[in-house]
Amino acid sequence: MSSAFDFEPQPRRASVAVDVGGVIVGGGAPVVVQSMTNTDTADIDATVAQVAALHKAGSELVRITVDRDESAAAVPKIRERLLRLGIDVPLVGDFHYIGHKLLADHPACAEALAKYRINPGNVGFKDKKDKQFAEIIEMAIRYDKPVRIGVNWGSLDQELLTRLMDANQANGSPLTAQQVMRETIVQSALLSAELAEELGLPRSRIILSAKVSGVQDLIAVYAMLAARSVHALHLGLTEAGMGTKGIVASSASLGILMQQGIGDTIRISLTPEPGGDRTREVQVAQELLQVMGFRQFIPVVAACPGCGRTTSTVFQELAQKIQEDIRASMPVWREKYPGVEALKVAVMGCIVNGPGESKHADIGISLPGTGEMPAAPVFIDGQKALTLRGPKIAEDFQLLVADYIEKRFGHGQAAAE
């Protein structure tokens, strides 16, 4: 085992840039956040509402299911409705089994979509496979659309898997079944991309993905793909699960890959709680990119975890309130206060780390812990600015944060500069 540990992120892997409806994926562009609806695409009202919500949350690409004629017919109407709302987010069509037929029968759908997602494992079977794959590629060429060749181990090409398993058995030093499965996933993606290029689709119109549900498997297959291709890569852990488990599994796998410079666009595939908010997956994707230092989307609120010194819940409530206000305000703030996403706010619960952490923030407050004087020093740009006292410390600090944002990022600051 090597004793060397490279703690810095590796340079981004060189990949071919792909233009997806005006959003650049790969080629050194910032890692793109995308999401997927779970509405019936034929339900235009519901799909428009969810796409709008995902876009507002920060999704830069939104994938929708196109599984039957009614869904395909709805796509151009959804696109038109979104544009009337001022929402120009690129829509990605998710096709399985009959994508070739739907694109041919619904040219308006083919035109309205910004990208087509193809699954090599179910695009067609036996002698129909290459023919139906070719038909989708021909449509992509006709309408000048990129495709994502998305392999998923739950629908893996069984013919290819069988062939590689048989070849492995004949090998004097056979691989494990897991290793053969990983190789099958990678070959399925690479062979499909090779065929697409032979059919005339340029490399600048191809994105690859290879999704599995195991963290170690995902890291392995993407490392293999990255080493054996220059295609832009879409990262995602499929069937990640619900709640904390899904967030941890996705963050662990995608975080490791991105630290190695691998990945051009990501989706956090969370199973929402019944009645849960679909935009949660967008928030998690943004937070992952932000905490790793790859992108900035929203001001950071640093808050201590609490301990026996902080029996009061005031600092927790204040931190939560500020975080909620920031997220709700960001759609307006992005336009009104350019650069505000770099802001750091600290809300600390006692004297131990409170003043120090607050000094490191742009604006911070150190609330009194158990047994401490009922006073809260506020630090602005590293200096103690004032001390808040009384029953409205939380409200007063929120006003100070709003005032700081206006002065630093508002028009007044721009004029002063």
Curated annotation (Swiss-Prot):
Residues reported to bind [4Fe-4S] cluster: 304, 307, 350, 357
GO biological process: isopentenyl diphosphate biosynthetic process, methylerythritol 4-phosphate pathway; terpenoid biosynthetic process
Single GO molecular function: 4-hydroxy-3-methylbut-2-enyl-diphosphate synthase activity (flavodoxin)
Enzymatic reactions: (2E)-4-hydroxy-3-methylbut-2-enyl diphosphate + oxidized [flavodoxin] + H2O + 2 H(+) = 2-C-methyl-D-erythritol 2,4-cyclic diphosphate + reduced [flavodoxin]
Keywords, comma-separated and alphabetical: 4Fe-4S, Iron, Iron-sulfur, Isoprene biosynthesis, Metal-binding, Oxidoreductase
Metabolic or biological pathway: Isoprenoid biosynthesis; isopentenyl diphosphate biosynthesis via DXP pathway; isopentenyl diphosphate from 1-deoxy-D-xylulose 5-phosphate: step 5/6
The keyword Iron-sulfur is assigned to this record: yes
Cofactor: [4Fe-4S] cluster
Primary enzyme class: oxidoreductase
Cofactor note: Binds 1 [4Fe-4S] cluster.
Family: Belongs to the IspG family.
Protein name: 4-hydroxy-3-methylbut-2-en-1-yl diphosphate synthase (flavodoxin)
Organism: Rhizobium meliloti (strain 1021)
